[in-house]
From Swiss-Prot:
Pfam families: Ribosomal_S15. One of the primary rRNA binding proteins, it binds directly to 16S rRNA where it helps nucleate assembly of the platform of the 30S subunit by binding and bridging several RNA helices of the 16S rRNA. InterPro entries: Ribosomal_uS15, Ribosomal_uS15_bac-type, uS15_NS1_RNA-bd_sf. This is Small ribosomal subunit protein uS15. It comes from Trichlorobacter lovleyi (strain ATCC BAA-1151 / DSM 17278 / SZ) (Geobacter lovleyi). Part of the 30S ribosomal subunit. Forms a bridge to the 50S subunit in the 70S ribosome, contacting the 23S rRNA. SMART domains: Ribosomal_S15 (SM01387). Disulfide bonds: none annotated.
Length: 88
C-alpha cells in the first residue's frame, strides 16, 4: 500500500489547484503508483492470485480514467501519459 507521504507527494506533483485531490490527473497518478507497487509485489509473490485480481481492477479503473481524460482534454491526457511513462 502507498505510504501517506508518497501519496501526498504524488498529489503535489499532479494537482491543478490548492486542495485538489480528485482531478483525473491526480487519480491516474495514484492508481499508477499502486499498480507499480503491486507489479513489484508479484515479482516476489508469484502465487498471490487474489491480489492479482485487484491489480486487474486497478488497471481497468486507470484505463477508464484515461479514456475519460482523453475525451475531455487531449492535451492534458498527453501530458499525463508522458509524465507517468504509460505506454499508449
Amino acid at each position: 500500500m502507498l505510504a501517506t507521504e508518497k501519496k501526498q507527494e504524488i498529489i503535489n506533483n499532479f494537482k491543478k489547484h490548492e486542495g485538489d485531490t480528485g482531478s483525473p490527473e491526480v487519480q491516474i497518478a495514484i492508481l499508477t503508483a499502486r499498480i507499480v507497487y503491486l507489479t513489484d509485489h508479484f515479482k516476489i509473490h508469484k502465487k498471490d492470485h487474489h491480489s492479482r485480481r485487484g491489480l486487474l481492477k486497478l488497471v481497468g479503473q486507470r484505463r477508464r480514467m484515461l479514456d475519460y481524460l482523453k475525451s475531455r482534454d487531449l492535451d492534458r491526457y498527453k501530458k499525463v501519459i508522458e509524465q507517468l511513462g504509460i505506454r499508449r
